Amino acid sequence: MGIKKFKPVTSASRYKSVLDFKEITETEPYKPLTLTLSYKAGRGDGGKISVRHKGGRVKRKYRIIDFKRRKTNVSAVVKTLEYDPNRSAFISLICYKDGEYAYILAPDGIKVGDTVQSGAGSEIKIGNAMPIGKIPPGTNVHNVELQIGRGGQIARTAGSFGTIAGRDGEYILLKLPSTEVRKVHENCYATIGICSNKDHNLVSIGKAGRSRWLGKRPTVRGVVMNPVDHPHGGGEGRTSGGRHPVSPWGQPTKGYKTRRSARPSDKFIVQKRKRNRNR
């Protein structure tokens, strides 16, 4: 999918770019598979902000996606390729032979009229889902389960994928987009192919208003706040007090490891992800 740029007739259009959406075949979702979810705008039950920089987005319907793909040995025809405002990847409406409809994450290269299937005996073809133990090494997969039957949790965003790197007993070695190598049980399901909308990272928002449509509010630097609001606040002129950068609650940031040590899933990590030292 290509990127559309604009003539600089305004300050906003000078840097703005959008996807051309030429591959999209449907503009309205399939209503039986949609929900209306209330938007909390980053507030908890008490009405207080629990997540900053959220609020004021455009209304949207939630599309119910089948991340489990457990309807096995029944082929389905791809009916549409649709935009989903709730995620960066595109989605596809599929119709099974028995007449049931479902939304799935659209893999890159899938087209209307293609057939997809789930199950251990499925063909190694883009869009088919099967136990990861049945997929040959070197194959790119997305929507990968970490727990059997829970549904895909890894490689679900636009252009993301994992690569089958090998086998270790009943576990499959999966190389993730972050360069981490992780063990996944051979009976966990995965979908063949790369997640759609690979050009998503090339889109430039271009103006503040477009971020507001997405529900993103402005981020104020701590150094321009008062001492009561942020550890970096106060002082004459621009100064952060000479301390290492911290969050508003005093937790070190910018390089500080915040991942909890000794997590139960650590035993499945074969190789940790490489950290970007140039930040």
Curated annotation (Swiss-Prot):
<comment type="function">
    <text>One of the primary rRNA binding proteins. Required for association of the 30S and 50S subunits to form the 70S ribosome, for tRNA binding and peptide bond formation. It has been suggested to have peptidyltransferase activity; this is somewhat controversial. Makes several contacts with the 16S rRNA in the 70S ribosome.</text>
</comment>
<dbReference type="InterPro" id="IPR002171">
    <property type="entry name" value="Ribosomal_uL2"/>
</dbReference>
<comment type="subunit">
    <text>Part of the 50S ribosomal subunit. Forms a bridge to the 30S subunit in the 70S ribosome.</text>
</comment>
<dbReference type="InterPro" id="IPR022671">
    <property type="entry name" value="Ribosomal_uL2_CS"/>
</dbReference>
<dbReference type="InterPro" id="IPR008991">
    <property type="entry name" value="Translation_prot_SH3-like_sf"/>
</dbReference>
<dbReference type="InterPro" id="IPR014722">
    <property type="entry name" value="Rib_uL2_dom2"/>
</dbReference>
<dbReference type="InterPro" id="IPR012340">
    <property type="entry name" value="NA-bd_OB-fold"/>
</dbReference>
<dbReference type="GO" id="GO:0002181">
    <property type="term" value="P:cytoplasmic translation"/>
</dbReference>
<feature type="compositionally biased region" description="Basic residues">
    <location>
        <begin position="270"/>
        <end position="279"/>
    </location>
</feature>
<dbReference type="GO" id="GO:0019843">
    <property type="term" value="F:rRNA binding"/>
</dbReference>
<protein>
    <recommendedName>
        <fullName>Large ribosomal subunit protein uL2</fullName>
    </recommendedName>
</protein>
<dbReference type="InterPro" id="IPR014726">
    <property type="entry name" value="Ribosomal_uL2_dom3"/>
</dbReference>
<dbReference type="InterPro" id="IPR005880">
    <property type="entry name" value="Ribosomal_uL2_bac/org-type"/>
</dbReference>
<keyword id="KW-0689">Ribosomal protein</keyword>
<keyword id="KW-0699">rRNA-binding</keyword>
<feature type="region of interest" description="Disordered">
    <location>
        <begin position="223"/>
        <end position="279"/>
    </location>
</feature>
<dbReference type="InterPro" id="IPR022669">
    <property type="entry name" value="Ribosomal_uL2_C"/>
</dbReference>
<keyword id="KW-0687">Ribonucleoprotein</keyword>
<keyword id="KW-0694">RNA-binding</keyword>
<dbReference type="GO" id="GO:0016740">
    <property type="term" value="F:transferase activity"/>
</dbReference>
<dbReference type="GO" id="GO:0015934">
    <property type="term" value="C:large ribosomal subunit"/>
</dbReference>
<comment type="similarity">
    <text>Belongs to the universal ribosomal protein uL2 family.</text>
</comment>
<dbReference type="Pfam" id="PF00181">
    <property type="entry name" value="Ribosomal_L2"/>
</dbReference>
<dbReference type="GO" id="GO:0003735">
    <property type="term" value="F:structural constituent of ribosome"/>
</dbReference>
<dbReference type="InterPro" id="IPR022666">
    <property type="entry name" value="Ribosomal_uL2_RNA-bd_dom"/>
</dbReference>
<dbReference type="Pfam" id="PF03947">
    <property type="entry name" value="Ribosomal_L2_C"/>
</dbReference>
